Amino acid sequence: MSDDTKKQDTAADAEVEKEMEGVPEHLRDDRGSEEDASDDLSAALESLKSDLEAAKQETLYAKAETQNVRRRMEKDIQDARTYAATGFARDILSIADNLARAIDAIPQELREDEKFKGLVAGIEATQRELDKVFAQHGVSRIAAMGLPLDPNQHQAMMEVPTDEVEPGTIVQEMQAGYMIRDRLLRPSMVGVAKKPD
């Protein structure tokens, strides 16, 4: 640097010093405070970005949870509509059982007797109507006889020794089982074949 430049810098520094008299010390260092302010702004900006990302994540989670709750509610409502008659149908099954027992208990000679033909026809018509109503509401009888035991639909009550069919095959149905659409309403109570001793 030349002497003239040094003199100018010194003169400028002296003027600046004179102007700065009376200014508090913490306000005099402009360069340091600008850097500190810049650092503070950068830190604040990073903090805000981090908070924004966290808020976005929370919003996404809340939206996903809301969708899941809505889907669960829709499924629950659909199930309630589909299976609303379950309790009532389960209670009516005993009536269906009693009608079937009544029909099975009528001897052949009474079926042909003119005095009882109307009664037998009425009981049989009632059974058919009940079966029709069951079908309208999705209640169906579970097939059992001659099929292999399915623990999801059948309940083995006893074992019957026999060589006529494969072991595990249903050979006797003591009580009919029913489904309501795709759900078990009541299992079939059955006797299952086993190998004789």
Curated annotation (Swiss-Prot):
Biased composition (Basic and acidic residues): 1-31
Residue ranges of the region described as Disordered: 1-48
CDD domains: GrpE
GO BP term (any one): protein folding
Principal cellular location given in the protein's record: cytoplasm
Protein purpose: Participates actively in the response to hyperosmotic and heat shock by preventing the aggregation of stress-denatured proteins, in association with DnaK and GrpE. It is the nucleotide exchange factor for DnaK and may function as a thermosensor. Unfolded proteins bind initially to DnaJ; upon interaction with the DnaJ-bound protein, DnaK hydrolyzes its bound ATP, resulting in the formation of a stable complex. GrpE releases ADP from DnaK; ATP binding to DnaK triggers the release of the substrate protein, thus completing the reaction cycle.
Assembly: Homodimer.
Family: Belongs to the GrpE family.
NCBIfam families membership: PRK14140.1
Protein name: Protein GrpE
Organism: Erythrobacter litoralis (strain HTCC2594)
